[in-house]
Structure formats: C-alpha cells, structure tokens
Amino acid sequence: MIQRERLAKDFDAMAQLTAPGEGINRLAFTDADWKGRQYIIDCMTDAGLTVEIDDFGNVLGYKVGKNPDLPVVMVGSHTDSVPNGGNYDGVVGVLSAIEAVRSMTDDGFEHDHTIAVVDFMCEESSRFGAATLGSKAMRGELTLQDLHRLVDKQGISLYDALKARNLNLDAIEHMEYKRPVKSFTEIHIEQGKVLEHKAKTIGVVTGIAAPERFYVTIRGNADHSGATPMNLRHDALCGASKIILGIEEIASMQEEPPVVGTVGVVEVVPGAMNVIPGAVKLGVDIRSISKVARDSVVTLIKEFIDVIAEKRGLSYTIEPVAQDHPVVMNPAMIREIEEAVKSVGVDYMTMPSGAGHDAMHWADDVPTGMIFIPCREGISHNPAEFADMDDIVTGAKILDTVLRKLSLESTKLN
C-alpha cells in the first residue's frame, strides 16, 4: 500500500536539498544536485534496491524479479531543477516510483521482470541549453563533441562538469543502456492548467511535443549612444526586439496542430546605458506535437530573421542546440494506465504533453506511457509550483498498479 506519510516525508526532505535562493535550486551537476541524488540513492537502498550509477551520473535502482533474464520494467524521472524552480517537477516521478517499489515490498508482491527505477541526470536545459541529457546518454545519443559543445553561462562545459564529478568521460559514446527494456513509465506534474480547468485528477498522456532550440546572435555596431544619429545606427537590440515579436506572431499563426515559440534568453553586449547594443544573443525554443508544423514555423522564423537583419544592416549567426522529435505513447501502455486509473476510481482525461520529458527518448522502440497529475494553476519552473499530496498519492497508487501489472511475464504489450 502507498503510504502517504512516508511519501510526504521524502518531499519535505528533498525541499531542503537546494542551493541558496528562492524556490528550489538544484542545477545539474552542482553540489545541491548531488546532495539530492544522494538522498535518492539512500531511499533506493533503504527500499532494498540494488543501486548503480552509470558513467553520466544517472542513478538506477533495481528491484530484482524472479527471472532476471527478462527485459526490465523501467520507471523514472529526474530531480535536477531549473533556477528558482519548484519541488515537484521531476521529483514526483522519482519519489512515486520508489514508493511504489516500497509498496510492493510491504505487500510481499512477487514479480517476474526486474523493475528499474531511474533518476535521470540533467533533464532540465537551464544549465547547458539542452534537455534530457541523461536519457540521451543512456540511449547513445550523446557524443564527446556534444560534451565540449554544451557550455553553461560560466563557461563550464558539460565535459568539465562531468569531469568534476569523476565520471568516465571516455565511455560516453559507448554507454548506451544495454539491457533489454520491456516498458518505460513516467509520472509527472502536468506543468499546465488543463487538468485543473477540466477538474480531472489524472491525465493519460497520448504524445509528447518536442523542442527545436537554437541561439541567434545578432550583430550591429556598438556606437556612442549620444553621438550617433538615429538614422546612422545599427542597433542589435532593436533588431532583436523585432525578431522576438516576429517569433511570437509566426508561432501564433500555426493553430492546428499548434506550435509554441519562446525566446527565453536575451544577452546584450556590451550592456551599458551609454552604448548602442552591438550584439544580442537570443535563446529560441520552438515546440509542437507535430514535427512538420514545428519545422514549418522554424523555417519561417529563419526567413524572418534574414529579412530583419538585411533591412537594418545587421549580421547574424544561428547556432543549433537541440532538435528532438515528438513522439506518441504506446497504445497498449495507454490502455494499461487507463485500466489502472479506473481501478483506483478517479476521473481522468487523455491529453498530449506540451513539455518534453525523459520518456520521449524511450518511446521509439520501448512501449512507453506517461501519467500526469495536476499542479496548482498550472504553475511550474517557479517557486510557486505546487502539487497537492492527495493527487501525488493517487498518482503513486496508479503507478504502483501499472508497474505490478507490467512486471508480470503474462502481461504482453502488443
């Protein structure tokens, strides 16, 4: 049985494991992140799991089944955070998975397949500009070149961050997860307002939108702000402002299937009040459940950037960061989750996920499913992020039910 008090205690403990600042601050590979991961390791060990840490820092806890040679039933999420984030994004998935395993142990539940609980490293893109890096590493999608290419705001490369944690950098191109996987399940807060608006307790995810991310650097002339007439300026920030508004407008025009566009990074050089901005770096994030729609919007945006730059006498460069592909959830997994929801007896709806998740990297060749619980007012990536413990417990019960069924050899996903 899922124990509310035990689960609540874990959330309280994780809330204390943060760097100074408002909300939760566990950026990937920082000391706070490492302390959070150590707590997860301790929880896994206390739950009787056999813990392994791979060469990228992903934490895997195994509850061995009666037939260890069968493909593993994988479940997990992440515990790193954005700056000034909340205590539920990702954490719900990891702690609920551990609690589900405890529940099985408490009940003496016997299962055929080994269950693997995973705390994926560096799911958030906040530090290195690319998301779900731990999952990508486990799927063989990261190269040594990527480790050097991805750099944080302090100039620290992903390579150096891994090296500082004594992880095996030379293994990165050979660390693809080798064990066969029967299924992958992730439970997560919705990070939107739909469930709350529809008064539904659970969302059964049908597909995951995926981002294309790139940096745009616009260059003009950093001239004197007082001595340069308006008609002789090449102001990079004014050009960037036009581009930002253009991205909003172009994304809004694509209604079905919808595309969302965000400029979440704006860096101005030299950043002085008496100097016309000479360069601006924009971080652009374009997402959709449809790759075709997303690609169309990205093409229009790049054409628009070219028009603005030429019109204003500016130059620009575009640096790709990530190009993930949207995925659909496995129909058999959707059915298993729906059956579990019905057995618990709560209202649910099927829905796509607008945010990316670790689950998307398993969905191509592993039957994958996701469960959403509501978060208050849809707020996430924010200190005000909140999920009600009643909803967390309900989600954990559903996850427990799903994992028990999947861990039986008699359950076929076809």
Task: Give the positions of each predicted feature.
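N-terminal hydrophobic or amphipathic helices/low-complexity stretches enriched
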Residues: 1-24, 64, 275-276
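Zn-dependent metallopeptidase/amidohydrolase metal-coordination segment
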Residues: 7-17, 76-77, 348-398
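A non-catalytic alpha/beta surface segment that caps or lines the substrate-entry region
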Residues: 19-64
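A short beta-alpha structural unit
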Residues: 27-29, 262-271, 283-289, 315-334, ...
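Active-site metal-coordination/substrate-binding segment of hydrolases
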Residues: 41-45, 50, 60-163, 389-394
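His/Asp/Glu-rich mid-to-C-terminal helical/loop segments that flank catalytic regions of hydrolases
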Residues: 208, 224, 228-253, 298, ...
